[in-house]
Amino acid sequence: MAERGSDIRPGHILEHNNALYLVVKVMHTQPGKGGAYIQAEMKNLKTGAKQYERFRTDGDIKRAIVDESDYQYIYGDGSMITVMHLKTYEQITISKDILGDKSIYLQDNIVITLVFYNGEIISAKVPDYVTLRVIETEAVIKGQTVSSSSYKVAMLENNQRISVPTFIKPGDKIVVYTPDDSYYERAKG
């Protein structure tokens, strides 16, 4: 679908130079001379290569028409995972690589979104927020207080290390913001 360059947003999938690109970051730039443009950081969905591209704000871009469907993770077998469509209960096996480095968030019954283009899976997304248990944390350095903005490193149940506030202790459940793999909050309940 044709749109203007000023309509580009992170998460959009564009058809550009005979390939599909996921828009990762967008910055609007108004130079002193000349017309405004959009500087977009994009990821080639086939090769995974990052690329920076400038689009005129009044220029045409072609947004890919994609379908998204939610699937529940059932189990993993090495480099492959089996997922089930939430409405039709159809089970399919796909490569874990489609999730990239976000495959560490796969856990029983998590719902992932598969993105289809012309009937073919082109990408997959985990939820933005995932709850995980803290397995171990670094010791708090004397002088650090709960009210200070200091952090310590924690190991999570998926063997991921992230920075957490000093009041988090082993056994706590925390919410992780998956787009940047950061601590979001202590899980409620």
From Swiss-Prot:
This one is known as: Elongation factor P
UniProt-listed Pfam families: EFP (PF01132), EFP_N (PF08207), Elong-fact-P_C (PF09285)
Q: Which domain of life is it from?
A: Bacteria
What's its job?
Involved in peptide bond synthesis. Stimulates efficient translation and peptide-bond synthesis on native or reconstituted 70S ribosomes in vitro. Probably functions indirectly by altering the affinity of the ribosome for aminoacyl-tRNA, thus increasing their reactivity as acceptors for peptidyl transferase.
Q: Which gene encodes it?
A: efp
Principal place of residence: cytoplasm
Q: Which HAMAP family match?
A: EF_P
Its pathway, per UniProt, is: Protein biosynthesis; polypeptide chain elongation
Q: Spell out the GO cellular component terms annotated for this protein, sorted alphabetically and separated by semicolons.
A: cytoplasm
Compartment(s) where it occurs, according to its Swiss-Prot or TrEMBL record: Cytoplasm
For this chain, the family text in UniProt reads: Belongs to the elongation factor P family.
